[in-house]
């Protein structure tokens, strides 16, 4: 790859042949939540850049997978990769996300991922 | 949350920083350039995409990767904003290309003058007999 | 047309468009300014050229034929991808995945009571290494905003209507995971080979906006209308 001053060389050295997010395996410490846990999405202030969709804020869902360790997107965009977190796949009932979602489709759900900082016990 | 609120929040972050005012060089390309769907029809070519679509994708990937000059998420937010406000009605991928050039000019990665000059040189190179 | 040829030359666009010129000019300036190298660009272009939906279709066909492979696909999408020739980690020129695709494929298994459909509301992320380039409609704010909110309506527009009791699960790939859908194997495919099965698993089936059907081997063509008004209808 080309010469860089952004820290992509460091990332390349760490991740080549291993993959991203695989290269952060083992760095996050114990996972706070496990599969089956109910979690609420926190409404943290967005500084500038977030991958936590506004439509999920405040909603309660259930952890369906503990997926990988990685720096949170909010840190990674500033090249702050020192403290990876656990990421979780969370399933929500659509009715929970959109109060006027039709009752006829009460089984419909939505699944999306969050880094640990965005979740709390309900 | 209403759809309007949702779209404002998704787009608002990049839109706050992006100047969508027209850039005359790109407006010229937009009005005078021939889009692939027209060219393909005229020449009877069945490929749905222009040959430069893939090189454009590679450029977008590398801008996000090599120097992180234009991270993917921001480029896409700006592309959404520009697609709605400035380049609505332009077919994809011409729209993606115009949005990329617009983002790059506004970020100072290239300037309009040098881009115009380079376009002239490229055009001469490609059309010389 | 040259004499002696029995077949006419393939038609070519014999004209230089300003868009073609703009793309090249942008790329050349970017290289001169050191934003990336010409070598990197050539390698990336070669890589992107290799990408298409066939490996994902074969992954589904294999999973339909082999229960153990299906379990692997659901448990470890990256490992299962290797068996259809896709290496999420070493395939891209970086050696650690691409900056927008990463290396965490999850295969979402449909059942008779759960139907998955994939979107990326934030930026239209897509599992390119196994599925190729995303279609234009997938990238539009129209699809991205509406699918999470009105999935039934959007799917109906794609010609897919499901029983109200079925759980439609929208997967929003907002972080590093990329998804493909493993649809339910349709009736009428008993005794089919892997090739025959792969042929009916179209890109749209793998995104989740269509279901595989014997005899249907192409994505439905969709006219794309630029959104004149932003979407906020009420139902």
Located regions from the model:
Chain C
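Terminal, compositionally biased segments used for targeting/anchoring and flexible tails
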Residues: 2-235
């Amino acid at each position: 790859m080309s010469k860089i001053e952004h820290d992509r060389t460091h990332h390349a050295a760490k991740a080549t042949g291993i993959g991203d997010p695989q290269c952060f395996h083992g760095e996050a410490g114990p996972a706070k939540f496990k599969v089956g846990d109910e979690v609420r999405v926190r409404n943290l202030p967005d500084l500038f850049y977030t991958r936590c969709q506004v439509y999920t804020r405040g909603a309660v869902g259930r952890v369906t997978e503990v997926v990988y360790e990685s720096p949170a997107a909010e840190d990674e965009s500033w090249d702050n990769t020192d403290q990876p977190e656990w990421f979780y796949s969370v399933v929500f009932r659509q009715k929970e996300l959109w109060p006027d979602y039709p009752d006829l489709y009460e089984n419909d759900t939505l699944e999306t991922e969050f880094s640990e900082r965005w979740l709390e016990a309900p | 949350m209403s759809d309007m609120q949702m779209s404002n929040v998704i787009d608002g972050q990049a839109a706050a920083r992006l100047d969508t005012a027209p850039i005359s060089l790109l407006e010229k390309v937009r009005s005078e350039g021939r889009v692939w769907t027209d060219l393909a029809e005229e020449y009877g070519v069945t490929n749905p995409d222009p040959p430069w679509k893939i090189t454009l994708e590679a450029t977008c990937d590398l801008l996000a990767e090599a120097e992180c000059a234009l991270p993917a998420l921001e480029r896409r937010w700006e592309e959404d904003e520009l697609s709605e406000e400035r380049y609505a009605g332009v077919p994809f991928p011409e729209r993606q290309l115009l949005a990329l050039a617009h983002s790059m000019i506004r970020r100072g990665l290239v300037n309009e003058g040098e881009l115009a000059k380079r376009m002239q040189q490229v055009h001469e190179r490609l059309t010389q007999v | 047309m040259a004499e002696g040829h029995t077949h006419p030359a393939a038609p070519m666009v014999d004209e230089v468009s300003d868009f073609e010129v703009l793309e090249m000019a942008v790329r050349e300036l970017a290289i001169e300014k050191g934003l990336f190298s010409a070598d990197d660009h050539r390698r990336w272009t070669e890589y992107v050229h290799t990408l298409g939906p066939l490996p994902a279709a074969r992954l589904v066909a294999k999973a339909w034929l082999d229960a153990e492979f299906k379990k692997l696909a659901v448990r470890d999408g990256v490992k299962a991808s290797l068996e259809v020739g896709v290496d999420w980690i070493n395939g891209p020129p970086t050696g650690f995945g691409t900056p927008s695709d990463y290396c965490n494929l999850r295969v979402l298994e449909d059942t008779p009571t759960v139907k998955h459909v994939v979107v990326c509301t934030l930026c239209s992320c897509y599992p390119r290494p196994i599925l190729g380039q995303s279609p234009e409609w997938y990238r539009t704010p129209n699809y991205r905003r509406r699918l999470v909110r009105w999935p039934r309506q959007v799917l109906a527009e794609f010609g897919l209507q499901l029983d109200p009791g079925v759980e439609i699960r929208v997967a929003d790939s907002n972080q590093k995971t990329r998804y493909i859908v493993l649809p339910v194997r349709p009736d009428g495919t008993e005794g089919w080979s892997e090739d025959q099965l792969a042929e009916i698993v179209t890109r749209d089936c793998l995104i989740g906006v269509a279901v595989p059907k014997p005899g249907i081997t192409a994505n439905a063509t969709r006219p794309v209308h630029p959104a004149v008004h932003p979407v906020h209808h009420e139902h």
